[in-house]
């Protein structure tokens, strides 16, 4: 459930432009921040403030404006009722499968709003601070779910949800975008900067290495010699390596803009025009910085609450629906939770803006693999819980093949609907694999 911003690669274009920490968003800051066109901007709704402007008291007008922009300023506002319904269902002991479903639906608009609020803060703090916020908090929902699952010692949920988000971005999001983008631009040549794909593929291969070695170590040890401690130590060391790589990735974009892939081009007026996104909204922030920080805290707390419900009821939902936990964690959680982000990537592909699409899909996958996963391992360490990077053979094989297929598809810097179809078919095969897999390992035994 990654945040709905154009993460890592495209968010980091904020870093390339420098930026200050002015209290008020200037026109130059707004221009530079807008260079990272986010998927959330595509599902924004035009706010009609005519009625609010008639309110006599200034303080009340500000409150109503904030409520309208934050709660009603998205096309996903129709899903907000799922948040209180999930709380009520949990409070009054409704079927736990319903609690899971309502929590999953409620997380979709909350994740999008976290992205929106981070974007608003970036307008006020400047592109450097805003870019760092997006680079570290771009997948806040996934991290919250993972940490809560660690607290409940449901390590399989942690690994499935994180791996599912990576596979979803590499195959489903990117595949859908390339397929539909290719069909809608049959008479146009779709191209992108291949350096962006090369950079992210290289980092994903590093993450794959760090996940594969603990699994290999586990298989090479004799059963009577294995106690798990060596694998855990290796996993923690590998986590530090991945974090160093991610930090180097940020620095590379910050200080080596002449070597790194250029930021996605700002779409022309005819490309970014949308009936629900006004020119005024594109000029700068629509709420104040402290209001954005306040709402960001509220949304994060709600995400934590629903994530707790989600983790505690996933096994009950799997039993009720006749599905394996593996299928729910790998397939359902990422698709439903990242629906807004997926839609944004597809829309950019429709508009022949594949660099932005790659920034969303590859950037999110890289951020989860190199930042969220190692942070989760280290947080578990601080909690006195042993978590390793052994994702098991089937999951690791799916990860490796997904990276390989994606890197092959993107190596020449061109796109067509056939490439997207291949990625989608790969995702279908993986989904079918986890759908039919109902082995004891697919149950939560701890």
Curated annotation (Swiss-Prot):
InterPro entries, A to Z: CaH_exchang, CAX-like, NaCa_Exmemb, NCX_ion-bd_dom_sf
Assigned keywords, A-Z: Antiport, Calcium, Calcium transport, Ion transport, Membrane, Transmembrane, Transmembrane helix, Transport, Vacuole
Cell compartment(s), UniProt: Vacuole membrane
Practical uses of the protein: CAX4 expression in tomato increases calcium content and prolonges shelf life and may serve as an alternative to the application of CaCl(2) used to extend shelf life in numerous agricultural commodities.
Entry GO MF terms: calcium:monoatomic cation antiporter activity; calcium:proton antiporter activity
Keyword Transmembrane set for record: yes
GO cellular component term of the entry, any: plant-type vacuole membrane
Membrane-spanning parts: 70-90, 97-117, 129-149, 163-183, 197-217, 239-259, 286-306, 320-340, 360-380, 389-409, 417-437
Membrane association type: Multi-pass membrane protein
Compositional bias segments (type: Low complexity): 1-16
Induction record: Slightly induced by Mn(2+), Na(+) and Ni(2+).
Region (Disordered): 1-33
Topological domain spans for side Extracellular: 91-96, 150-162, 218-238, 307-319, 381-388, 438-446
Region (Cation selection): 138-173, 337-372
Role this protein plays: Vacuolar cation/proton exchanger (CAX). Translocates Ca(2+) and other metal ions into vacuoles using the proton gradient formed by H(+)-ATPase and H(+)-pyrophosphatase. Cation selectivity transport in tobacco root tonoplast vesicles is Cd(2+)>Zn(2+)>>Ca(2+)>>>Mn(2+).
Alphabetized NCBIfam families for the sequence: caca2, cax
The protein, known as: Vacuolar cation/proton exchanger 4
Organism: Arabidopsis thaliana
């Amino acid at each position: 459930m990654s945040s709905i911003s154009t993460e890592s690669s495209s968010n980091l274009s904020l870093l390339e432009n420098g930026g200050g920490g002015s209290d008020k968003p200037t026109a130059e800051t707004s221009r530079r921040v807008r260079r990272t066109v986010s998927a959330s901007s595509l599902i924004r709704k035009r706010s009609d403030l005519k009625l609010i402007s008639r309110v006599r008291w200034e303080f009340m007008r500000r409150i109503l404006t904030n409520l309208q922009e934050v709660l009603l300023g998205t096309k996903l506002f129709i899903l907000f009722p799922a948040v209180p319904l999930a709380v009520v269902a949990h409070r009054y002991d409704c079927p736990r499968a319903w609690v899971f479903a309502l929590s999953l639906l409620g997380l979709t608009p909350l994740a999008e709003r976290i992205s929106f609020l981070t974007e608003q803060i970036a307008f006020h703090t400047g592109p450097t601070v805003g870019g760092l916020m997006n680079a570290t908090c771009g997948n806040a929902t996934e991290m919250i779910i993972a940490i809560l699952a660690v607290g409940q010692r449901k390590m399989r949920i942690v690994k499935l949800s994180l791996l599912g988000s990576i596979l979803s971005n590499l195959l489903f999001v990117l595949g859908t975008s390339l397929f539909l983008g290719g069909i809608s631009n049959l008479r146009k040549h779709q191209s992108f900067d291949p350096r962006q794909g090369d950079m992210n593929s290289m980092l994903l291969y590093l993450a794959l290495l760090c996940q594969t070695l603990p699994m290999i170590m586990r298989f090479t040890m004799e059963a009577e010699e294995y106690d798990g401690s060596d694998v855990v130590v290796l996993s923690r060391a590998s986590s530090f390596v991945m974090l160093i790589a991610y930090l180097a990735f940020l620095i590379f974009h910050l200080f080596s803009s002449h070597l790194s892939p250029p930021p996605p081009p700002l779409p022309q007026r005819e490309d970014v025009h949308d009936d629900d996104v006004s020119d005024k909204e594109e000029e700068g922030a629509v709420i104040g910085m402290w209001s954005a920080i306040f709402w960001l805290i509220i949304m994060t707390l709600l995400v934590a609450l629903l994530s707790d419900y989600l983790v505690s009821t996933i096994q009950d939902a799997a039993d009720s629906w006749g599905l394996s936990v593996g299928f729910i964690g790998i397939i359902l959680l990422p698709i439903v939770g990242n629906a807004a982000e997926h839609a944004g990537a597809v829309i950019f592909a429709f508009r022949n803006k594949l660099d932005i699409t790659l920034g969303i899909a590859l950037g999110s996958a890289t951020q989860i693999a190199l930042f969220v996963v190692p942070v989760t391992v280290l947080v578990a360490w601080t909690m006195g819980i042993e978590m390793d990077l052994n994702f098991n053979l089937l999951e690791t094989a799916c990860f490796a093949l997904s990276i390989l297929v994606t890197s092959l598809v993107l190596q020449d810097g061109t796109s067509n609907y056939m490439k997207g179809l291949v990625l989608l078919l790969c995702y279908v095969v993986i989904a079918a694999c986890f759908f039919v897999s109902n082995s004891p390992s697919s149950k939560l035994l701890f």
